[in-house]
Regions:
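Conserved N-terminal beta1-alpha1 strand-loop-helix module at the mouth
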Residues: 1-195
């Protein structure tokens, strides 16, 4: 089980998340996000950790995704909307809304799919949940996101049986600032589940 703490904006939160057991950190490169971090600032943080570093992109041109990933020192591009860039590891992020079709998960291009809760005009970090029973049983890596925290992650894992889980806003005191106790509690709860 991988555990991703997303919306990292400062080194203190990155280091605390890794110390608590996070195996993946997410950095948001969508300028309209309250958790947006400049690629150069993300690089300073990313260079201090040895876990998987995922850059979050929304409808960004593939060439720009690759350029930002190099500047920021990211390992994987998590892409909401738009084309997947070639030559880099990718996760396709998809909101599980009324238009969600499990057949989309057969696309061989991304190495994983991140399934998130829908919210009009917002891409991740909303704190909203979706019906976890809608996550299909497929032979693909699925990362479950959307309103997860220590109080519900075990139930979400039991229902959806994902490869990984991702949390952001439910671990914060303010957008982009993590509550380290909430981070620890979330990671402990996720890692305690055996599926």
């Amino acid at each position: 089980m991988i555990v991703k703490v997303c919306g990292i904006t400062i080194a203190e939160d990155a280091l605390a998340s890794v110390a608590a057991g996070a195996s993946v950190l997410g950095f948001n490169f969508y300028p309209k996000s309250p958790r947006y971090v400049r690629p150069e600032a993300a690089r300073v943080i990313a260079d201090q950790v040895s876990v998987l570093r995922v850059g979050v992109f929304v409808n960004e041109a593939p060439g720009d995704v690759v350029r930002i990933m190099k500047i920021a020192g990211m390992d994987v591009a998590q892409v909401y909307l738009g084309a997947l860039p070639a030559g880099v590891r990718t996760w396709r992020a998809r909101n599980v809304d009324a238009t969600f079709d499990a057949a989309e998960l057969s696309d061989p291009a991304p190495e994983a799919f991140l399934l998130d809760a829908p919210a009009p005009g917002v891409h991740g970090g909303t704190g909203h949940m979706f019906d976890w029973s809608r996550v299909p049983s497929v032979p693909r890596k699925i990362v479950l996101a959307g309103g997860l925290d220590a109080s519900n992650v075990a139930r979400a894992i039991a229902i959806a049986k994902p490869w990984g889980v991702d949390a952001c806003s439910k671990l914060e005191t303010a957008p982009g600032r993590k509550d380290h106790k909430r981070v620890r509690d979330f990671i402990e709860a996720a890692m305690a589940v055996h599926v």
